[in-house]
UniProtKB/Swiss-Prot annotation:
Protein name: Leucine--tRNA ligase
Binding positions (ATP): K621
Annotated NCBIfam families: leuS_bact
Organism field: Shewanella woodyi (strain ATCC 51908 / MS32)
Keywords of the record: Aminoacyl-tRNA synthetase, ATP-binding, Cytoplasm, Ligase, Nucleotide-binding, Protein biosynthesis
Length: 859
């Protein structure tokens, strides 16, 4: 065995072995319990970052641990390879997205292999290949046949100069990223999938997700947003027209003093014909940012339409206002406004001098709305026959009256909206729909799938090549001329079913049901919490669609979810002569002064620029504070990087990158290697004879088996990998100091090291693989079982008892583990410190906590 730990040499050799023996390639085996471990697949951006490394290390640790439990473990990998960054890179280089994407895949694949992740590479998929998206297109046509797909107009970001649709990321301060033209909202036809048909099931089945983080489940419940309320009809005064509103607070309806409608509401557009002010307001609203964050932050504005609505219960007329906080594509496009009991309505009413009428008051106090709305539930007053009712009684009574008069009905609504899957981009899967000469829209026939995206294109940054190439859209259906859809799928489509394709990646069908139902659901899914409401919801939705089309049996795609925290690093900048911040890589920084807590006070870069230290922040290109995994692996080895990633923080918390801690991880592996080397150098060992061990040897063996039990529990149940590693480190401290003179000393060391390398195998697999062999084992470590704690070793022969007199420590005694209370008392009273502090006193009470404490009360 070589004396020095040489990670590059060891890791290359072990990785070659895994590749040659196809160690991690698996097939279905009904005689073995399966375990499907999956980390969210990467976008091939060019290089792995530390966030990737953390995600995939966690997944690999779980997968390797489960393998040593004797399970049939599937851990696949692939590439979420469609998307806007490839288009942007192609525009920048006047090239095509495909070569850029495939080059990045090749590079990142080598990086993943370099880190020693145990993937079944035979199942590798790339979502930009026709072999993959063909089945996505096929599935979409099946959903269309089931009535789950429809087309309607929806708003997009539009650049009038380039005459093109922009993604949200391409809108900078309201302008086009390329030509700086002001972006407007434009209505264009788009395809939608009816996720709302599954809203109830998506919500109720959250209760099945026992092993998902509560935070993710809460976020999904809120995103789906089920509410119970009443939809009621308001008649427009002096007109045959009417409109509906929906409210979850019908108890406040008697306090309605105005109605707010969306600028795009038909009533507003009609009224605008006679109001230039309203027409201008409608135009202004058309170009407004309607994201939730923008809506929450913007100034609430409105214009009176001149129209009035008739209150469905009182018959009173209330003004109708067009307001920028009401959206036409959300709810009914109209809301009843009760300023006394809604803060937004209150502020709007104050601003425009509208009436405020209180109708709800606290049970035990008078209503005070002099400074703000009263938004709590309470008791109705000023509400005619509903006076004195509480929320639920008022809800029921108002519902009954509106229903009886045909003016309203109880209704369940959802915040969730149908999924718009059309993207006016090029680098995505073509939507498999065609328009016939008579305008009829039909799915592409199955025998014409896949609709292949041409890859040999040049991006000009203005129009999608498949929109610009009029010939590409031309096709024939049953001999009749037709035009293909030139929109492509939202890339969330590809990531919504990739986990299932891994089960049968080469099947000439979307899924092989037998294989899919062997592997699914995923046993452990790992990814960032930022995906809680988009990917993870679509992922669940698609699984139910797959089930309802007969391809899978289960209701949910993943049993257990782990959401790992971000990786943070120090961030520094200086301000250049133009007043702009220039972010400097931590690798280019010299810290000149720190405070008493070790925080940076003064730092400069290699050019002498004085830097501002902004603290730890998420590694990002924008702050130039990313650390290249390749550099760290070259410097310390993959196992060191993996060990640091798992030890530095619990997996769901943020991890602060500190190279000094990476060095600490490296020192630990070198120490482990040295202990093993010194042990192996002493030659072969005899078998361990547990019965002949002395007290110190038994104590060391007890610590070993306690560690085995704790590490298994920390990894499997608690997923506290950092505390598992800490336990092994503590044990190694003991082993380093353990005697090795006798044959049984060395036999015990052999048992301990054989266990330690298996405990660490999921985390530092290259080192563990090598040490396992050096310890004289013929089998490869992947083919052995996780160590089991010897229960008999955990039984203590003796106990250390603390002896107190009047609550103060006076002695420590060692007694047999099965000693009686009387024997412990006798031994305790015989101690010199006890005699001294009880002499001449009367013993009033003796308290014995078995195996721990003897307290003598005397005065």
């Amino acid at each position: 065995m070589q004396e020095q730990y040489q990670p590059s040499e060891i890791e290359a050799k072990v990785q070659q072995h895994w590749q040659d023996t196809k160690t991690f390639e698996v097939t279905e085996d009904e005689n073995k319990e399966k375990f499907y471990c999956l980390s969210m697949f990467p976008y091939p951006s060019g290089r792995l970052h530390m966030g990737h490394v953390r995600n995939y290390t966690i997944g690999d640790v779980v997968a390797r641990y489960q393998r040593l439990q004797g399970k049939n473990v599937l851990q696949p990998i692939g590439w979420d390879s469609f998307g806007l960054p490839a288009e942007n890179a192609a525009i920048k280089n006047s090239s095509a997205p495909a070569p850029w994407t495939y080059e990045n895949i090749d590079y990142m694949k080598n990086q993943l292999k370099m880190l020693g992740f145990g993937y079944d590479w035979s199942r590798e998929i790339a979502t930009c290949t026709p072999e993959y998206y063909r089945w996505e297109q096929w599935f979409f046509t099946k959903l269309y046949e089931k009535g789950l797909v429809y087309k309607k107009t929806a708003s997009v970001n539009w650049c009038p100069n380039d005459e093109t649709v922009l993604a949200n990321e391409q809108v900078q301060d309201g302008c086009c990223w390329r030509c700086d033209t002001e972006v407007v909202q434009k209505e264009i036809p788009q395809w939608f999938i009816k996720i709302t048909d599954y809203a109830d099931e998506l919500l109720s089945d959250i209760d099945q997700l026992d092993e998902w983080p509560e935070q993710v489940k809460t976020m999904q419940r809120n995103w789906i947003g089920r509410s119970e309320g009443i939809e009621m009809t308001f008649q427009v005064a002096d007109s045959d027209e009417s409109f509906d509103i929906y409210t979850t607070r019908p108890d406040t309806v008697m306090g309605v003093t105005y109605v707010a409608i969306a600028a795009g509401h038909p009533l507003a557009e009609k009224a605008a014909a006679n109001s230039p002010e309203l027409a201008a307001f409608i135009e202004e609203c058309k170009n407004a940012d309607t994201t939730e964050a923008a809506m929450a932050a913007m100034e609430k504005k409105g214009v009176a339409t001149g129209l009035y609505a008739i209150h469905p219960l009182t018959g009173k007329q209330v003004p109708i206002w067009a307001a920028n906080f009401v959206l036409m594509n959300y709810g009914t496009g109209a809301v009843m406004s009760v300023p006394a009991h809604d803060q937004r309505d209150y502020e709007f009413a104050i601003k425009y001098g509208l009436a405020i009428e209180g109708v709800i008051k606290p049970e035990d106090a008078e209503l005070d709305i002099s400074e703000e709305a009263y938004t709590e539930k309470g008791v109705l007053f000023n509400s005619a026959e509903f006076d004195g009712l509480d929320f639920q009684a008022a809800f029921d009574a108002i519902d009954a009256k509106l229903t009886a008069e045909g003016k309203g009905k109880r209704q369940v609504n959802f915040r969730l909206r149908d999924w718009g899957v059309s993207r006016q981009r090029y680098w995505g899967a073509p939507i498999p729909m065609v328009t016939l000469a008579d305008g009829t829209v039909v799915p592409t026939p199955e025998d014409q799938l896949p609709v292949i995206l041409p890859e040999d294109v040049v991006m000009d940054g203005i129009q999608s090549p498949i929109k610009a190439d009029k010939e590409w859209a031309k096709t024939q259906i049953n001999g009749e001329d037709a035009l293909r859809e030139t929109d492509t799928f939202d890339t969330f489509m590809e990531s919504s079913w990739y986990y299932a394709r891994y089960c049968s990646p080469h099947a000439d069908e979307m899924l092989d049901p037998a294989k899919a139902n062997y592997w699914l659901p995923v046993d452990q899914y790992i990814g960032g919490i930022e995906h809680a409401c988009m990917h993870l919801l679509y992922f669940r939705f698609f699984h139910k669609l797959l089930r309802d089309i007969g391809l899978v049996n289960s209701d949910e795609p993943a049993k257990r979810l782990l959401t790992q925290g971000m990786v943070l690093a120090d961030a520094y900048y200086y301000t250049n002569e133009k007043g702009a911040r220039v972010w400097v890589s931590p690798a280019d920084v010299t810290v000149q002064e720190t405070d008493d807590k070790g925080r940076t006070v003064k730092a400069v870069d290699s050019h002498g620029n004085e830097l501002v230290y902004t603290g730890m922040s998420k590694m990002s290109k924008s702050k130039n504070n990313g650390i290249d995994p390749q550099e760290m692996v070259d410097k310390y080895g993959a196992d060191t990087v993996r060990l640091f990633m798992m030890f530095a923080a619990p997996p769901e918390l943020t991890l602060e990158w500190q190279e000094s801690s990476v060095e600490g991880a490296h020192r630990f592996i070198k120490r482990l290697w040295k202990v093993a080397h010194d042990h192996v150098a002493k030659g072969t060992t005899v078998s361990l004879d547990v019965k002949s061990l002395d007290a110190k040897q038994k104590e060391l063996r007890r610590e070993l088996h306690k560690t085995i039990a704790k590490v298994g529990d920390d990894i499997e149940r608690r997923q506290m990998f950092n505390t598992a590693i800490a336990s092994v480190m503590e044990l190694m401290n003991r082993l380093q100091k353990a005697p090795t003179e006798t044959e049984q000393d060395r036999a015990l060391m052999q048992e301990a090291l054989s266990a330690v390398v298996r405990l660490l195998y999921p985390i530092i697999p290259h080192t563990s693989f090598s040490l396992w062999k050096e310890l004289g084992n013929e089998e490869n470590i992947e083919d052995v079982r996780w160590p089991e704690a010897d229960e008999s070793a955990l039984v203590e022969d003796s106990k250390l008892i603390i002896v107190q007199v009047n609550g103060k420590l006076r002695a420590k005694i060692t007694v047999p583990a099965d000693a009686t209370k009387e024997a412990v008392e006798a031994q305790g009273f015989a101690e010199e410190g006890v005699i001294k502090h009880t002499e001449g006193k009367t013993v009033r009470k003796v308290i014995y906590v078995p195996g721990k404490l003897l307290n003598i009360v005397a005065n």
